[in-house]
Structure formats: structure tokens, C-alpha cells
Amino acid sequence: MAEIEREVRSLVAKIIKRDEKSIDPNANIFTEYGVDSLLGVEILAGLDKKYGLDVPEQKIREIKTLNDIIRITKDYISKKAG
């Protein structure tokens, strides 16, 4: 699962144009890193392309931090594998 964390961090960093190491996984990505709805859609599209992840609207509303994105991605992959 650590690999998933690295991949998701890399994906988000690339989209928001930040160095991976500079992203605080607990910081609000909207207020701290200027993620707007378009960048949010780009992040979700990247997750869909990489993992086939289709995030339900209810879960989208829960996303505030990089850790939220990682958790939702891991949950999806676990359910898909199980």
C-alpha cells in the first residue's frame, strides 16, 4: 500500500505543480495549495485513469487533504481486490 501512497502523491503533485515532498498530507489542498474544482476534477480523472477509480459524489465531498485522497484510493483498491 505504500506504493499507492507514492503514486497518488506523485499524481497530485504533478497536477497541482508542486514538489511531492512539499505537500503536507494533512493540509487542506483547497486552501493551502489552491486546488479549485477544475484541478479537483483533474485529480479524480487521473485516479480513474490509473486505478479505474470512480469516486461517488458522497466521497468527493469528504476530500479535503492528500491523506483523504490516499485513503479513498486504498479503500477502493481493497474492495476491488476483495
Residue ranges and their predicted role:
Residues 2-35, 39-44, 49-82:
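Phosphopantetheine-dependent thiolation modules in NRPS/PKS and related acyl-activating systems
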